[in-house]
Amino acid sequence: MSLAYYPGCTLKTKAKNLEDPAIASMEVLGSRLEEIPRWNCCGAVYSLADDDLIHQVAPVRNLIRVKEQGKNEVVTLCSFCLNTLKRANLLMKEDAEKRGTLNSFMDEEIDYGGEVEVVHLLEVLKDQVGWEALAQKVKLPLRGLRVAPYYGCTLLRPREVAVDDVEKPTILQELLEALGATPVDFPEFAECCGSYQIVSSPDDIPKYAWHILNSALSHGAEALVLTCPLCDYNLGQGQKELMKKHDEFDGVPLFYFTQLLALALGLGPQVCHFELNYGEPELLLREKNLLPRGEAL
């Protein structure tokens, strides 16, 4: 089965450890992530200004690319891309005036009215693959690995584009259980990582990181699993600064959900690119006998 796939910019530069494991894992699960042609940046942040329709052109054009392929669904991995594409799609579905203005402006494109559904790969795993079927494919159960699911902002907010229940999401926990790991709930599962304050107020990022990471550790987690490259960067860079200032803080391994998926499916560290991760996750994996000692990353 072929799934229309929108990668977004970061997965082609700084987040190969999010994309490569996903592509390989879906092949094992019987699906192919087929990159849509001529895609462009999603726009990164959804614009809320009524008089700023030009910022909707980028995400809508990507949805048009999917429609041109005859597909009615597009899969994303990056939660920021998901959020922006979903909100632009809702605009095109629900606001006839703005839909007309945008279609008129993009007069060289086919008309678009929200025909494509935007889904996250987590939703594909849950609703199309199924947790039971996924568990049956696991070759290396992640037993003994205690992982805190970190959702961040954009997977769950605003409510109309959330991939799960906003107050009590379980989709990441269910994935971890299917892979044999132990999910560890903690109160800061949806707290903001600081987002683009890394640009405007970089000194604040370690404070966000400490609040989130320390909470996860205090609830018994050994690592975090996440979906967003910006969350990964902020928590990773934040903990680097924390380790400089606090000798007792050793850092927290950060995993993308696709890496744990690929590892459990038996695809090996070469697919997972653990060398690109923050928090030296390979040390934890070796301790749990999930990565052979001396295995090249």
Which stretches of residues belong to each language-model region?
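Iron-sulfur cluster-binding electron-transfer modules in prokaryotic oxidoreductases
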Residues: 1-297
